[in-house]
């Protein structure tokens, strides 16, 4: 017992010194690049500033988070380890035995296959030296004192070799995917509100400067891949809604939907959006040939790329999505779900969307969550107000344009909320992070509503005149 307490008393991040020089060099390179840009008198755009801050914070998170201390990183890497060692996907058993992948063995395999290819040259045979679980950890208890660490860390281990370096490499891979997601959020917001560039800036900031988004991106997680794939898919859907059917665009939509279906089950909530966009464009343009390419492409690509995994689930678990299997392994709720349960668990749910670190047991200041709650409520009120305005002036082409695009994102967010509510009825493990695969729909909606409400507040405080232009 005394030896265990001694091990737990060791610093949780002894290996930071080993990568400090590498990170210092990266920061110096960024600083020199920034000075070079200024010396050439090339100002950075708002999006570029957000990306720069995201990268700086992302490197900091990468260094500050000990190996396997990021949320579920231990089991995501366990899936990768199993795939590398056996060359096959995990088969979930209900015999009570612990596995290296836990409930995440039920996840779709695309992210883990890419990660296995990325880390193939690396030797991870020392993985067991990193995977020393803290038996006294107080996970998912942000108000608990002490025992925050999931792992007992060994000061002699290096992050620059073996499994430690594989984790570092995958974290940097996740950061790159996160940067792509921020760009896509910005582009999607430009589609939704082309006359208000402020919306795109706010949406990108709500994504790239969200501490939890940075934390998840700078960890080993399949959320990073799902976020960028879903963002690209939503952008192409909005483009199809605006421009009509284009063969290349339709085929890319079909391919992206197939890929994202095999990266995260959450992505399937985009299927109604695909069907709705195709139907609306067909009704508006009467382009039957384009519609055939669009709908047949979706079916063919999905059957070729993703169908096998869902059929495998049916054969193994008698369910296509694997959700019941995952919930049973994660820990079934074991009681009747009610609104009382929903409200009691919502506090941690909303905290874990904006920032709840480690094993969901390291929280930020209460004022931070309060301010973001106010912002979220303001955004929802602004969305309702904007929709009422657009419906009132729906005779104008621009109003119909903005209403169509906003409605597509709102429908996606609504269906995602229904899916999260269903998942919450199955297991206790429902945190705000599970919304991230569709953050490319959530952030633009929040930004549109927030900017709309702030604009009307400013408008009411400032006397209108001919020079006043809507931001």
Task: Locate the predicted segments by residue.
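Perimembrane helix-loop-helix junctions
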Residues: 11, 25, 29, 236-242, ...
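Interfacial juxtamembrane loops and adjacent helix segments
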Residues: 82-172, 330-333, 361-365
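Membrane-lumen/periplasm interface segments of multi-pass, membrane-embedded glycan/lipid transferases
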Residues: 314-393
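Membrane-interface helix-loop-helix junctions at transmembrane boundaries of multi-pass membrane enzymes
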Residues: 36-45, 244-245, 282-296, 382-411
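Membrane-interface alpha helices of multi-pass inner-membrane proteins
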Residues: 249-265, 270-271
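Transmembrane-helix signature of polytopic, membrane-embedded enzymes
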Residues: 48, 137-157, 161, 185-209
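Short helix- or helix-capping micro-motifs
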Residues: 54, 203-208, 235, 257-261
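Membrane-interface transmembrane helices that cradle and orient dolichyl/undecaprenyl
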Residues: 190-194, 233-249, 260, 282-284
């Amino acid at each position: 017992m005394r030896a265990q307490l001694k091990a737990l008393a060791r610093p949780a991040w002894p290996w930071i010194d080993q990568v400090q020089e590498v990170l210092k060099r990266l920061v110096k390179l960024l600083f020199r690049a920034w000075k070079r840009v200024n010396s050439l008198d090339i100002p950075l755009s708002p999006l570029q500033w957000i990306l720069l801050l995201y990268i700086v914070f992302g490197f900091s998170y990468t260094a500050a988070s000990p190996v396997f201390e990021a949320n579920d990183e231990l089991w995501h890497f366990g899936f990768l380890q199993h795939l590398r060692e056996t060359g096959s996907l995990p088969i979930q058993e209900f015999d009570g035995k612990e596995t290296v992948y836990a409930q995440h063995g039920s996840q779709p395999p695309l992210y883990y296959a890419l990660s296995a290819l990325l880390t193939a040259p690396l030797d991870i045979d020392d993985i067991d030296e990193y995977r020393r679980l803290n038996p006294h950890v107080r996970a998912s208890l942000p108000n608990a004192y002490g025992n925050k660490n999931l792992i007992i860390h060994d000061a002699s281990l290096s992050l620059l070799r073996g499994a430690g370096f594989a984790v570092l490499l995958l974290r940097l891979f996740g950061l790159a995917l996160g940067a792509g997601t921020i760009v896509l959020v910005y582009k999607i917001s430009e589609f939704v509100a082309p006359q208000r560039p402020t919306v795109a800036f706010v949406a990108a900031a709500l994504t790239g400067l969200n501490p939890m988004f940075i934390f998840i991106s700078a960890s080993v997680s399949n959320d990073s891949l799902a976020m960028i794939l879903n963002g690209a898919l939503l952008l192409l859907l909005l483009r199809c809604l605006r421009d009509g059917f284009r063969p290349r665009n339709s085929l890319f939509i079909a391919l992206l939907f197939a890929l994202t279906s095999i990266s995260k089950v959450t992505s399937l909530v985009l299927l109604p959006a695909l069907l709705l966009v195709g139907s609306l464009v067909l009704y508006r343009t009467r382009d039957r040939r384009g519609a055939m390419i669009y709908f047949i492409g979706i079916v063919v690509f999905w059957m070729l790329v993703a169908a096998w995994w869902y059929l495998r689930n049916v054969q193994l678990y008698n369910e296509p999505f694997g959700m019941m299997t995952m919930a049973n392994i994660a820990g079934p709720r074991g009681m009747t779900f009610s609104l009382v349960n929903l409200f009691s668990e919502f506090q941690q749910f909303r905290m874990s969307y904006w920032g709840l670190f480690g094993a969901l047991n390291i929280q930020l200041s209460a004022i931070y969550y309060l301010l973001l709650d106010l912002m979220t409520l303001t955004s929802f009120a602004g969305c309702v107000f904007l929709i009422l305005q657009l419906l009132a002036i729906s005779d104008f082409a621009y109003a119909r344009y903005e209403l169509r695009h906003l409605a597509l994102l709102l429908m996606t967010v609504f269906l995602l909320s229904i899916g999260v509510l269903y998942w919450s009825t199955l297991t206790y493990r429902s945190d705000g992070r599970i919304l991230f695969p569709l953050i490319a729909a959530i952030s633009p909606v929040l930004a549109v509503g927030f900017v709309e409400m702030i604009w009307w507040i400013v408008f009411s405080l400032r006397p209108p005149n001919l020079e006043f232009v809507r931001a």
